[in-house]
Design a protein with these regions (language model features):
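Flexible, compositionally biased loop and terminal segments
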Residues: 1-250
Length: 250
């Protein structure tokens, strides 16, 4: 048994990990403030945590990891902080381009990319295209960039309405399955587990459609300090729950 599998065993897991885990990467700013550092240092530390957790998820058999990198509301932050976040994303993508194909990691973006700087938008599109041909069985990381759950649903509704107006669809054709194909997450299963570090206990406009039956796990650990052991705890907590999807326990 590999070292990774030994870790899983000692974590007390009852079964395989969730197929899809989503994380609200929260607490970067507070982590930096506690250490007397600029908020940008917290985002840099948080980016390294993402790398580590993504690799760990891939190694333990998680198929999809979706992370909240930048919300539609984050534009309200200072120009310095927004620029630092975008620079980190650019740095990560430039480095990832050279390794994703080799490591069989697919990268996909959720969100409205229109307001994103052209250079970063083109880079995101390039990385998406580079990994598009990889097997559907390979690990996939979804990065939510300029993303908001309400905005995602609204964009999908507008697309459906436009097709109805053009006579391509009829309103009565629409059901949950069809509507989901208009979302950023089209073709991707809903997350079984949503994790939020930092002690906050709210969704913050994250995956509002997809979270209908997700389990939620909250921890006071700030995102830069979130490690493999913390993820093990979250998965163990998830596996201890009775998921009934609106039914009753048998």
């Amino acid at each position: 048994m590999s070292e990774t599998r030994n870790t899983l065993h000692t974590a007390g897991w009852a079964a395989s990990p969730p197929r899809h885990i989503a994380i609200i990467m929260d607490g970067n700013g507070r982590w930096a403030t506690q250490r007397g550092l600029p908020r940008t240092a917290g985002h840099k530390a948080g980016a390294e945590t993402f790398r580590r957790i993504a690799t760990y998820c891939k190694n333990i058999g998680v198929k999809y990891l979706t992370v909240y990198a930048f919300s539609t509301e984050n534009w309200k932050r200072s120009e310095t902080e927004v620029s630092a976040i975008m620079a980190l994303l650019k740095k990560y993508l430039l480095e990832a381009v050279d390794t994703m194909e080799r490591d069989h990691i697919r990268l996909h973006f959720f969100g409205d990319m229109t307001p994103i700087a052209p250079e970063l938008r083109a880079l995101a599109h390039e990385t998406d295209e580079i990994t598009e041909h990889l097997s559907k069985d390979d690990f996939q990381a979804n990065v939510c960039l300029n993303y908001g759950g309400r905005d995602e649903i609204l964009r999908a509704v507008r697309r459906v309405a436009a097709e109805c107006a053009e006579g391509k669809r009829k309103p009565e054709d629409l059901d949950e399955t069809l509507f989901s194909t208009y979302l950023d997450s089209a073709g991707i299963p809903d997350p079984e587990l949503i994790i939020r570090p930092s002690g906050e206990q709210r969704l913050s406009n994250f995956l509002l459609w997809q979270c209908a039956y997700s389990e939620f796990y909250y921890t006071d650990t700030l995102w830069p300090d979130f490690d493999e052991e913390e993820l093990d705890k979250a998965i163990a907590a998830y596996q201890s729950r009775d998921r009934r999807f609106g039914g009753v326990k048998k």
